[in-house]
Amino acid sequence: MPSIKSDIEIARAAAKKPIFEIGAKLGIPVEQLVPYGHDKAKVSAEFIAGQAGKKDGKLILVTAINPTPAGEGKTTTTVGLGDGLNRIGKKAIVCIREASLGPCFGVKGGAAGGGFAQVVPMEDINLHFTGDFHAITSAHNLLAAMIDNHIYWGNEENIDIRRITWRRVMDMNDRALRSMVSSLGGVANGFPRQGGFDITVASEVMAILCLATDLTDLERRLGDIIIGYRFDRTPVHARDLKADGAMAVLLKDAMQPNLVQTLENNPAFVHGGPFANIAHGCNSVTATKTALKLGDYVVTEAGFGADLGAEKFFDIKCRKAGLKPDAAVIVATVRALKMNGGVKKDDLGTEDVAALKKGCANLGRHVANVRRFGVPVVVAINHFISDTDAEIAAVKEFVSRLGAEAILCRHWALGSAGIEELAHKVVELAESGQAKFQPLYGDDISLFEKIEIVASKIYHAGEVTADKAVRDQLQTWEEQGYGKLPVCMAKTQYSFSTDPSLRGAPEGHIVTVREVRLSAGAGFVVAITGEIMTMPGLPKSPSAERIFLNEQGYIEGLF
């Protein structure tokens, strides 16, 4: 039996075309592309502005059920579907997020797809790429430095150092930095205070970059950032410290979407990268809107399960950007359904139809949740070698009882040839006119009510609890004019509840909101639930231990 090639081996053997040829497919002139080598480029702001009057293509969201730690192939399916649509004659563009170094060296691995459904250059995309994350980290930490510098030189804004909310960031999983004391070592180093680090993908600057429509909007949003509060409890904004202009300068190039290609030489935008469990989990509005002007179909993904990424895609990204999705694909795997049915991780390769049927309750809830937003749904069964015919048949039968269709997809092994059936179904749904998109809640209800609606309608929680301090903080923000903002739930990705071990489709559980953060620049309120951390830690045996350069200087073990 021939050995199965790793993702990195497949990507390395790709017959890539020069990036200018990929741009030409979309009608992007050579002079409007800023090349980063031969296989990746940024699209100029001038070109993007010139597309404003064009008609939009169809927008397709790819989401998933609650995943196993390794993920269920959502990005792989997004890339495969883009290739599949091109294969059947549609002009399709893939829009995905950039990879964070945290999961790359942690537990999940890369974020460029897998098998024969990848975007390339895979190694670059998973590592430093075009430097966007560096720019975001630098802009975020510039503001942090300017806060402490302002206090050191007299604190003209009367910032209460006990109420500084702006933390520092880095693009790495490092639990040791979650809580720290800075400015120790004497008067020359400033005023000691407690702070900490978040991972870059949880940064409000990341969210701002992904939601801003142009450089003017970017700078306005950066200025709106609240870094803390004065002694009189009034908010201090980044523009009060004159930091917004310099931050925008650092982000000027990062605002331009990155163009790359799939293994089948189809165009893909890879831009922005907020996590969906601790941020809003969607690629940039700029990339999505640009792709909609250039293609007949745009296939994008939102992180983790539909309870997180899809809800935020609909309630934050689509609401803020005026987007109206035409269809949604929910990725399910036999192994994840069995895990949601109670099967242990080590036993997922063994046939267990009974457990799978039990776990299908998780899939059923995700289908119902997406339909709640008025978007038609198809289920993609991402095929794994260990799947049996009986298990696949059980999934198809379950989904058919929901009035939807489940389609077996083999894009990981076969590329676009393995996903043609799904591509045809997506076209059918998108062209049917069934989509009647609407957000889950209106702007005018209270912030706590918005949290309760997401928890009850999407998570099926019986109750939302929060300390008086949390409720009072939400009320204060409402009084300050932030009551119309949507909420961004920070929650475990492994369950509908806040308990990662509670699988399936739990009912009546309690969602505890332990902290809330106002992202005034991004335009949402983050509600942190359960034990979720905005700075992850590395697992006992991180992926980094298995990544190295071989004797030829090639990267091994990345994915």
Swiss-Prot record:
Signal peptide: none annotated. GO terms for molecular function: ATP binding; formate-tetrahydrofolate ligase activity. GO terms for biological process: tetrahydrofolate interconversion. It is an enzyme of class 6 (ligase). ATP binds at residues 68-75. The keyword Nucleotide-binding applies. SUPFAM superfamilies: P-loop containing nucleoside triphosphate hydrolases. Keywords: ATP-binding, Ligase, Nucleotide-binding, One-carbon metabolism. It comes from the Bacteria. It holds the Pfam family FTHFS. Pathway: One-carbon metabolism; tetrahydrofolate interconversion. The keyword ATP-binding applies. Coiled coil: none annotated. Transmembrane segments: none annotated. Its EC number is 6.3.4.3. Belongs to the formate--tetrahydrofolate ligase family. This is Formate--tetrahydrofolate ligase. It comes from Rhizobium leguminosarum bv. trifolii (strain WSM2304). The gene is fhs.
